[in-house]
Structure formats: structure tokens, C-alpha cells
């Protein structure tokens, strides 16, 4: 990564970060982070969220957490929407260059911690049927398949892809992130 890229991805909010692991930190996402988050999103997906999508989520009070590397670079993020006794995981993304290093698991664990603190009983999400690595992460964390949303995601120029709907019941014990 070049110096300009590194500075563009650098953390910028004022809240003190929380330790996620020996080499990573967590903190809330804020408006100053949107350029870096949007860059990661565009590098990770063929149909990424826009800067406006992220800005709307922040303005709407959605839960939005960042995962930072030891040198302060944003390496991933998670966004969720709180509901009545449940939370909908909307977006969990790790920069492609640092995927498969446990960062997604750390972000998912942080969201689960926040959801439990609220007293929510369920965490649910949609995931592309073609996204086997994400499905594996969610299943290892205790999520179960509960349905299918046909044509949920855009795919290609005019196509659509089905979404697998998954749920994690938080009222019990023994799930993969305990």
C-alpha cells in the first residue's frame, strides 16, 4: 500500500479504540471514515454500498464498528440495524488484502457483544448464495439457515442472485463466538 493509500485508510474518529486482538483494535465508525470505508467496499464487491448508503446508516444511528490494524489502518467494518429484540447484520466487510486472518470473526464477535448488551435475542443476516467463505464464518459462529430470498442481490449487468437468510439465536449458550 502506498503512503497516500495508507493515509486515506487511516483511522480518524476520536473515540479510544478497544483491543480486538494483539494486532487489531475496534472503534466506532464516523463520517470522517467514509472515504476509507467506501474504498474498501469498492475493492471487495461488484455491487458495493455507496458513500451515501454508509452516510445514511450513520445518520440513522445504525451500529457501525471499524477494525483497525496496529498501525491505525481500517481493515474492516460491520454495520447492523437494531430492531425489536433482534439485530439485522447489514454489512460485514474485510479488505480483500487481509481476508482470512480472523478479522471477520473479530468484527462478528464485536457485533454480537453489542447485540447481547442490548438484550436482543436474535441476530440475522442475508448472504449471497455464492459467498461460501462468509457462510462458513457465520455457520462456525452458530448461525443457522432459515430461508432464501430469491433475486435479493444484483449480479452481473442485469442478473440477480438469491440470498441465504441466516439467524443466530442469542438466548442460549454454546455458539461459536462464546
Label for each model-derived stretch:
Residues 108, 131-134, 151-157:
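Short glycine/proline-centered loop/turn elements that form peptide/ligand docking sites
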Residues 3-9, 19-20, 24-101, 105-118, ...:
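Acetyl-CoA-dependent GNAT
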Residues 115-126, 137:
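Conserved GNAT acetyl-CoA-binding A-motif
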Residues 126, 139, 144-165:
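Conserved catalytic-core motifs of GNAT/GCN5-like acyltransferases
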Residues 93, 129-131:
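Active-site-proximal loop/turn and secondary-structure-junction residues that shape catalytic pockets
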Residues 15-18, 123:
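Generic short amphipathic/hydrophobic targeting helices enriched at N-termini
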Amino acid at each position: 500500500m502506498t503512503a497516500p493509500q495508507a493515509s486515506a485508510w487511516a483511522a480518524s474518529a476520536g473515540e479510544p479504540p478497544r483491543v480486538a486482538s494483539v494486532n487489531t483494535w475496534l472503534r466506532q465508525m464516523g463520517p470522517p471514515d467514509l472515504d476509507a470505508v467506501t474504498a474498501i467496499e469498492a475493492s471487495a464487491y461488484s455491487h458495493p454500498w455507496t458513500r451515501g448508503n454508509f452516510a445514511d446508516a450513520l445518520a440513522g444511528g445504525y451500529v457501525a464498528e471499524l477494525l483497525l490494524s496496529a498501525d491505525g489502518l481500517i481493515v474492516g467494518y460491520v454495520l447492523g440495524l437494531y430492531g425489536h429484540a433482534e439485530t439485522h447484520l447489514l454489512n460485514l466487510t474485510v479488505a480483500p488484502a487481509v481476508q482470512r486472518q480472523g478479522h471477520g470473526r473479530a468484527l462478528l464477535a464485536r457485533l454480537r457483544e453489542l447485540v447481547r448488551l442490548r438484550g436482543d435475542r436474535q441476530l440475522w443476516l442475508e448472504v449471497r448464495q455464492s459467498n461460501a467463505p462468509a457462510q462458513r464464518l457465520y455457520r462456525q459462529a452458530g448461525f443457522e439457515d432459515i430461508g432464501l430470498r430469491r433475486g435479493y442481490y444484483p449480479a452481473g449487468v442485469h442478473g440477480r442472485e438469491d440470498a441465504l437468510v441466516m439467524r443466530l439465536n442469542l438466548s442460549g449458550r454454546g455458539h461459536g463466538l462464546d
